[in-house]
Amino acid sequence: TLVDETLDELTREKLRAFPPDLVGITVPFPGNVYGALRIARMVKSIHPKARVVLGGGYVNTELRQLSDPRVFDFCDYITLDDGERPLLALVEHLRDPNQPLVRTYVREGNRVVQKTTPALLDLHHRDTGTPTYAGLDLSQYVSLFEMLNPMHRLWSDGRWNKLTVAKGCYWKKCTFCDLSLDYIARYETATADVLVDRIEALIKETGQTGFHFVDEAAPPAALRALAERLIARRVAITWWGNIRFEKSFTKELVELLARSGCIAVSGGLEVASDRLLALMQKGVTVAQVARVTRAFSAAGILVHAYLMYGFPTQTEQETIDSLERVRQLFAEGCI
């Protein structure tokens, strides 16, 4: 197809300009798998001695029980969870095969084997350093949006530097969530000043002052500390991120977040039914969500809510009632 040919040509151009020894490909979603494998195949075709490693969100959730060795026709290694330690171990292993690997799948014969070394610990969130866009021509990226809703547009319209306020989830109780996954289970924070240092470094590198905090759910206390340090250090940014609609987000805190540059939040309402919210162990009620979303909206902050229908035991009447409560939230300008 035209898309295939375009992807192949772009890959060839990069491989000719920068002959690699090691290529890492992030596979965040199912829709990225085909492109990732196509790029990996091209790397192997042009530079047979280059090593290819896959990682990312899709790998972390869907390939934890990998048993089919055919994927290694395209790549050499697959790493799980946070990439810093596995990639560092892989680089050292390629220099010296006696060095151990960490959470890395390899093919041995016709079998998939996971190599790991528990003694080699992951880097703490405070020590992972600042993300970098070095070598990436950001001017080549265009803004796209599929609808006029200003909240929905944020995901693809504009330029957002990505950062994480805290690693993992501080709540870790929702029954529909896989709490065993490292990116949820291992909760770690960094100081507000460390976060502001990273923000300033990204602004200097990219020239962009828009930030998307991609936490599972940013902790209210950490957001308060971050907002206070942004204001105290006179760092002017525009930011948005994911939260839980919990009572800690008072009118006073929400107004502080707005002053620090917050323009939008996204959170999981899931179902507008207190019985089902209790079954989910969400730790919120419909009335509480209404109060919190109203506080954000009153401060001029856009609010997006995730919803799900057909949760186990949900009755027809509960579905109707939930739809009506969501309609009321829209009508009142809360979301």
Residue ranges and their predicted role:
Residues 43, 47, 230, 293-296, ...:
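Hydrophobic positions in alpha-helices of CheY-like receiver
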Residues 44-50, 231-236, 330-334:
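Short helix-capping segments at alpha-helix termini
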Residues 110-163:
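N-terminal [4Fe-4S]-dependent radical SAM core
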